[in-house]
């Protein structure tokens, strides 16, 4: 759609934060996952109501060693994804970010406090987790790989639940 065309036309995705502006320049911009081929990691970032459709769309990128990291809000997201992808490794994760698509090709962040937590759920870090943490850090992302990822997911779930209740009760945005 218009977002994809704007990214292609600008040679990247423009990101505006309170402290900086930059153009993220991905090596591949497509709406066809089959063009990408199999990958090592998939960051699955969509809304809960689009999970089933999204899983169907990413299937061409899933190989024998692919790790999927869903970053949807909710306490049971990884478990639900595993029902769609029983033969694929699905990790757990959550992010704290306040961002929106302001216009085609433009993402606006409201704060400079982005946090990214992920993990396999195993008691020890795997080599693949260490590798992803290094890749994210090299890209300037504050990524953390705690062994107790479920605690971080539940903490965010509780924060969202309280916030959603308050905004619904008072009929006000955050």
Where in this protein do the model-derived segments appear?
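Rossmann-like NAD(P)(H) cofactor-binding subdomain of soluble oxidoreductases
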Residues: 21-106
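Structured helix-beta-strand junction loops
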Residues: 10, 64-65, 139
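Extended, non-catalytic scaffold segments that flank or surround catalytic motifs
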Residues: 2-3, 43
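Short, conserved catalytic or adaptor-binding loops enriched in Gly and charged residues
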Residues: 18-24, 134-137
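Internal alpha-helical scaffold of NAD(P)-dependent oxidoreductase catalytic cores
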Residues: 60-61, 84-89, 104-174
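Short secondary-structure capping/turn micro-motifs that flank functional sites
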Residues: 3-5, 24, 99, 152-153
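Short, charged/polar "capping" segments at the starts of alpha-helices
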Residues: 3-6, 78-79, 126
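Glycine-rich phosphate-binding loop and adjoining beta1-alpha1-beta2 segment
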Residues: 3-22
């Amino acid at each position: 759609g218009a977002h994809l065309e704007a990214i292609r036309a600008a040679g990247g995705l423009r990101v505006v934060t309170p402290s900086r502006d930059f153009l993220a320049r991905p090596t591949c911009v497509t709406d066809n996952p089959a063009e990408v081929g199999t990958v090592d990691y998939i960051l699955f970032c969509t809304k809960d109501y689009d999970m089933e459709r999204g899983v169907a769309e990413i299937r061409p990128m899933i190989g024998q060693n692919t790790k999927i990291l869903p970053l949807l809000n909710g306490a049971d997201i990884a478990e639900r994804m595993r029902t769609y992808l029983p033969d694929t490794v699905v990790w757990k994760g959550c992010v704290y970010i306040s961002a929106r698509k302001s216009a085609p090709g433009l993402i606006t962040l409201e704060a400079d406090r982005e946090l990214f937590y992920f993990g396999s759920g195993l008691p020890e870090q795997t080599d693949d987790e260490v590798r992803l943490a290094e890749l994210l850090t090299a890209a300037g992302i504050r990524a953390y790989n705690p062994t107790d990822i479920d605690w971080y997911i539940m903490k965010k779930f509780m924060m969202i639940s309280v916030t959603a209740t308050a905004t619904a009760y008072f009929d006000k945005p955050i």
